[in-house]
Amino acid sequence: MDKTTVYLPDELKAAVKRAARQRGVSEAQVIRESIRAAVGGAKPPPRGGLYAGSEPIARRVDELLAGFGER
């Protein structure tokens, strides 16, 4: 874990201290949990393509669009 310094206004520092005391945890724990809740935990898994498959759809564009727009 890396050490980070954060400057807090007096009223926010007092709120962190109060929350830590009420929950029986350290102020650092309250701050870590608050940051985690605000920015999320782990990175989201990478998303696949919209039409993820073994063959790129662009290779079949002519076949797939044959007759498109014709009546």
From Swiss-Prot:
It holds the Pfam family RHH_1. Keywords: Toxin-antitoxin system. One of its GO terms (biological process) is positive regulation of growth. It comes from the Bacteria. InterPro entries: CopG (IPR002145), Ribbon_hlx_hlx (IPR010985). Transmembrane segments: none annotated. SUPFAM superfamilies: Ribbon-helix-helix (SSF47598). Antitoxin component of a type II toxin-antitoxin (TA) system. Upon expression in M.smegmatis neutralizes the effect of cognate toxin VapC26. This is Antitoxin VapB26.
